[in-house]
């Protein structure tokens, strides 16, 4: 399991992970930065299924499932 890396975009955190040499972004982080009121709805309505994965991460001793999106999914949320 890859570890999350956190970057800041205009002082807001963006969590990323690399899977098979491709960057993926935590969808919730991107949707919130872009101003979507409901991140889960934005990802469901705008990102194609082939551009998102549910990935399990371990944080603070707990496993959490997060929706991560690839670069194409990122552009789907932007445009």
Regions found by a protein language model. Give the residues of each.
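An anion-engaging/catalytic patch
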Residues: 1-79
